[in-house]
Amino acid sequence: MPAPRPQRLVRSAGALVWRFADPTRVAVSGEPIDPADIEVLMVHRPRYHDWSWPKGKAENGEPLVGAAVREVEEETGHVITLGVPLTTQRYRLGGGQTKEVHYWVGTPLPADDPAARLRAPVARAPRTEIDQTTWATPEAAADMLTRRGDRRLLADLVARACEGRLATSTIIVLRPGAADAAPIDAASAAPVGGRASAPGTSVSGGTALGSAPTPGPGSAPGSPSVPTVPGGPDPLAAAPAAPTPRPAPTPAMVASAAARRAVQVEWASSLTAEAAAHPADPPLGRFGVRQSFDLIDLLSAFGVGRAFASPSARARQVLAPWAAVGGGSVTLVEALGVPVGDEAGADKDADARAARVRAFAAQRLREQAGATLLSVTGAARDLIVEEIRAYGSSAIVGASPVSLGHGQIMVAHVEQGTDGPVVVAVETHSVTTKNPAVPTRRASRRH
């Protein structure tokens, strides 16, 4: 069996981890930092005889942010959380491959931090791969680094520190997984008269309302057919010239009205059955439940410590595994709920409701609370994303709007400037949960 062809793009991830030289000092967003007051974490690779940033290849099906925090812990022993993304490094390898390394600003986490407890245990890298780790000042690190790309990353970190942009907060918007497709109920889906029933379309027995019934006895060829009842009056009899009082309903008219009423009742019953099969607030589907467990790694990588959720079932249920294992608290926010039924008709004060959602998002942006998660469904999520873009830098505002898929997160990194919060970077990440119900596409073979 021939060996598989190597991938031309090798994806790796790492972090520039920094801390204050004074362990009692706390970072404040927007506060300029003297580079001499911080230290950066470096690793020595005996194979290349160089100092570099901790990084490594992403495992099969592993999100890049998960690979970044895992590789840093394997190579240095430090559990970290990720901040703003840095410039992606690309360089050629042997065999026609290209290595792409994604970097983030990283900060160490205390051992008792909830985000640290959610991480999978790792094995330290062998000494043949990493034999030394050290904390160094940026000035010393610049002399130790051998790769020009690594020095550019350090210069970016130092510039952020001097400008008060090194410490940032994070707002994460999550779109919960989808609900399962409701099974078709045989009773509610059974057609009436051999086809789907609807008001004014069919009646029991298969005769369509408004269509021509079977001509009765005495009907003239080509004349409109009118149902007759044995022993009843001739429906084709000529009307008297002089106006007369309206005649009493005939048995045929009574039967027709009863049939029409039966159709309306049956249609209403079918709508009730459909509403039961497709509830307005469906629970999280089976695949969405699996995604909720894999979300723990994504949320832990950014150090999420608190979450807000809309009252919908899926928005709450997707956070259940994360909260159950001690990830943090979940606060339900009624203002983020979507009215049941048609939104335009259910919420007559749509503008006021949209203003409440935007105000909630703006309040979260102004807070300096580490990483905050918003699990929201429906139109409220779109409003929050729009509000985040409104606070963005020129690069964020000019970029295409973010459209989230089920189980996907949007991560907004916020700097607290003199004029208020500014979103300086936006990234999206997805869980890599495999869905056995969806067939995978096989790559075509070339012969």
PLM-predicted stretches and their roles:
Residues 2-53, 172, 176:
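N-terminal strand-loop-strand
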Residues 43, 169-175, 308, 368-384:
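Beta-strand elements within well-structured catalytic alpha/beta cores of enzymes
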Residues 43-48, 424-438:
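Short, solvent-exposed aromatic-acidic interface loops
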Residues 56, 67, 167-341, 400, ...:
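Active-site-proximal alpha-helix that buttresses catalytic centers in soluble enzyme cores
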Residues 58-149, 162:
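Unchanged
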Residues 150-168:
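Charged phosphate-binding loop/patch that engages nucleotide di/tri-phosphates or the phosphate backbone
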Residues 352-366, 370:
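A short, acidic, amphipathic alpha-helical segment used as a generic capping/interface helix at domain edges
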Residues 392-422:
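Domain-level recognition of soluble alpha/beta enzyme cores
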